[in-house]
């Protein structure tokens, strides 16, 4: 399975699982070594999920557990998914010290 196929699977699982938990998606951003192109065989996938609105902890936890489990089972690579809401992203997207700024600068919206 190549890079593009894995990315398509990751996006599909995130979108499908978000629908299940009524999570509105604003953006899905791949960042880190996979986005920069300097990844190795052992690199994980770093995903920033920007939601339309803030979601409660319980929903966030259920979403993360289910989506990560499905993704890892399907592509057999480790993955980190970070969730922030649109307001956080918009406020901090120009600050490199924040995850929003890092993802905006080096990330690829998928």
Model-found features: residue ranges?
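Catalytic core of pol beta-like nucleotidyltransferases
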Residues: 1-27, 36-41, 51-110
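Short beta-strand->loop micro-motif that forms the acidic, two-metal-ion catalytic signature
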Residues: 46-50
């Amino acid at each position: 399975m190549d890079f593009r196929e894995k990315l398509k699977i990751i996006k599909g699982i995130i979108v499908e699982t978000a629908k299940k938990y009524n999570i509105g998606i604003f953006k899905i951003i791949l960042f880190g070594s996979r986005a920069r192109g300097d990844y190795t065989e052992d690199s994980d996938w770093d995903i920033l999920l920007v939601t339309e609105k803030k979601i409660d902890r319980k929903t966030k936890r259920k979403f993360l557990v289910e989506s990560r489990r499905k993704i890892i089972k399907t592509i057999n690579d480790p993955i980190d998914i970070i969730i922030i809401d649109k307001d956080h992203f918009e406020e901090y997207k120009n600050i490199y010290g924040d995850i929003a700024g890092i993802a905006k600068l080096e990330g690829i919206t998928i």
